[in-house]
């Protein structure tokens, strides 16, 4: 069975942010190696935790490692994308929860498994599917999507300033022969980036691989849908903790949380008291994102990009 090498970042801060109640109902939307799930379980007495992952590897791993909690009926593992949060919980007759945690970092051996095609460091067939059951793969994106669509995803999801020249090189190469492996794609990406730019800013394929992975798995679309459902599922006093590792995800979370905690546009400015029914139903627990301590940064280089945002439901209403 595959081992999970992922070191959980901001573990204590994210779980503490949920303010776990011993008899509450909680969701770990990103099971992965089970780090956050275990930390939440330690605080539950008669409560229940539903942990989601669309990757069969993660489910199988945790069935074995968290067997006791499952047998004690404290834990339910759900094999599905977290964009189906509400439907899955509804199937267990769960209408409201006390807290939901998201760790959007890479936490599965799928990224360490060269055969899955996520890494520009290992040669493998182009794949990048987190859910092996889905049809769309990186092979199709790279070889079949039109130039304009490639430019769009490279720029939007990879924030790649050489998106046009990279997309043009991909288009030219695939006319000769399909791009079938990660190393073939890396070579094409390098051709699309000026030599001077390749010498700075890390691996030249990093941004493009991120963009293609996000497109293949519709990561931002899934996150937005899931957070909308999560906010709706919360009981009063319930919280959502979200750990992001890249600016696109953090921007989305920040924007959605700001919308939920801001006054309605109908409220006149400068009122000494906000009229009843117009107050926000949510509040931010931390105005600025929580970041890793110096100690954690020294122990785990991945923690440098981690940001934790927490929101609480303070009253009923939409």
UniProtKB/Swiss-Prot annotation:
Its chief place of residence is cytoplasm
- GO molecular function term, any single one: rRNA (cytosine-N4-)-methyltransferase activity
Give compartment(s): Cytoplasm
Q: InterPro entries, from UniProt?
A: RsmH, SAM-dep_MeTrfase_MraW_recog, SAM-dependent_MTases_sf
Record flagged with keyword rRNA processing: yes
SUPFAM superfamilies for this protein: Putative methyltransferase TM0872, insert domain, S-adenosyl-L-methionine-dependent methyltransferases
Annotated Gene3D superfamilies = Putative methyltransferase TM0872, insert domain (1.10.150.170), Vaccinia Virus protein VP39 (3.40.50.150)
Look up the record and report any one GO term of the cellular component aspect.
Answer: cytoplasm
Q: Which PANTHER family match?
A: 12S RRNA N4-METHYLCYTIDINE METHYLTRANSFERASE, S-ADENOSYL-METHYLTRANSFERASE MRAW
Identify this protein by name.
Answer: Ribosomal RNA small subunit methyltransferase H
Source organism of the structure: Limosilactobacillus reuteri (strain DSM 20016) (Lactobacillus reuteri)
């Amino acid at each position: 069975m595959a081992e999970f090498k992922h070191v959980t970042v901001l573990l204590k801060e994210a779980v503490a942010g949920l303010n776990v109640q011993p008899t509450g109902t909680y969701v770990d939307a990103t099971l992965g190696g089970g780090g956050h799930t275990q930390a939440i379980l330690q605080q539950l007495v008669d409560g229940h935790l539903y942990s989601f992952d669309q990757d069969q590897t993660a489910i199988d791993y945790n069935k074995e490692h968290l067997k006791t909690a499952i047998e004690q009926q404290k834990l339910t593992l759900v094999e599905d994308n977290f964009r189906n949060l509400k439907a899955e919980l509804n199937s267990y007759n769960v209408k409201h929860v006390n807290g939901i945690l998201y760790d959007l970092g890479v936490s599965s051996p799928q990224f360490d498994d060269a055969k899955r095609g996520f890494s520009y460091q290992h040669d493998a067939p182009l794949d990048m599917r987190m859910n092996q059951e889905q049809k769309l793969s990186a092979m199709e994106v790279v070889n079949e999507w039109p130039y304009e669509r490639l430019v769009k995803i490279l720029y939007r999801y990879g924030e790649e300033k050489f998106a046009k020249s990279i997309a043009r090189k991909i288009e030219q190469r695939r006319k000769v022969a399909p791009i079938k492996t990660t190393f073939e794609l890396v070579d094409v990406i390098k051709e699309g980036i000026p030599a001077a730019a390749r010498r700075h800013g890390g691996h030249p394929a990093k941004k493009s691989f991120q963009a293609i992975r996000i497109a293949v798995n519709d990561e931002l679309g899934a996150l937005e849908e899931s957070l909308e459902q999560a906010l709706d599922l919360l009981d009063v006093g319930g919280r959502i903790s979200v750990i992001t590792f890249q600016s696109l995800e953090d921007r989305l979370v920040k924007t959605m949380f700001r919308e939920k905690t801001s006054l309605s546009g109908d409220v006149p400015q400068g009122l000494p008291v906000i009229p009843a029914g117009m107050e926000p139903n949510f509040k931010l627990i931390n105005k600025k994102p929580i970041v890793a301590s110096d100690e954690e940064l020294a122990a785990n280089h991945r923690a440098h990009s981690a940001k934790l945002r927490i929101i609480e439901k303070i009253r009923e209403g939409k």
